Amino acid sequence: MNLHTYIVALLFSILITTASAAEKIVMLRHAEKSAKGLGQLNCQGLNRALALPNILIKKFGNPSVIYTPNPSVRKKDQGQLYNYIRPLATIEPTAIRLGMPVNTAFGFDDIKSLKEALLNPIYSNSVIYVVWEHHLLETMTREILSSFGKDPKIVPQWDGNDFDSIYVITIADSKGGHKKVSFMKDSEGLDNAQTSCPN
C-alpha cells in the first residue's frame, strides 16, 4: 500500500468512526387526540401517524430502538382513566414500516427509568425514537441536558396545541472522553394533515 492510499484509508476510517460515535435521541409528542380524550388519537392524529414514517426516516434514519409508554398503565384523560395508547398508535406505522418492535417497558410517568435507559452506553452510536407525553418529554429533555452541564433553559416550552415539534438531543464523543451534548428543535411539517379518517 503506497503512502497516498494509506492516508486516504486512514482519513476514511476516522470519518466513519467520528460519524458513528454519537447518540441521537429523537423525541416527538403523540399525534392529535380525541376531543373526549379516551387515551386515543383522532382522525387527524391517525393521518399524522400514517405520514410519519417517511418524515422520520428521511430526517433521522432508521432507529436502533423505539420507546413509547406502556399502554397498560392508565392515565387520566378528561377526568377518566384510560389505557394510554396515543404514543404507541402514533409510532406504530413507522415501526411496521421498519419491521421493528416497540419498547413499552416504562409507564408514561416513569421518565426516570426512561432517561436511564436512553443514557445507557449501549446506545452510544444509535438513533432512538421516543414518543411520549409532551410535558414529560420537555421535563426529561431539560434533565438530560442538565446532567451534562448544559443550560436547561435552552429547551422551549412545549405548547399544548403543538403536535408537530420534534426535540432532538445529540450526545457525541469528544476529546478526553468527555461528551459533547447539543439540543435542537425540529418539526414534522404535518400540521395540515387531513381531519377526516382514511376510507
Spans of model-derived segments:
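Sec/Tat signal peptide C-region and signal peptidase I cleavage site
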Residues: T17-A21
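Short beta-strand segments
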Residues: V131-E133
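Active-site-proximal alpha-helix that buttresses catalytic centers in soluble enzyme cores
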Residues: A22-N125, L136-N199
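Bacterial N-terminal signal peptides
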Residues: Y6-L15
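Conserved beta-strand position immediately N-terminal to the Walker
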Residues: I128
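N-terminal secretory signal peptides that target proteins for export/translocation
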Residues: M1-L3
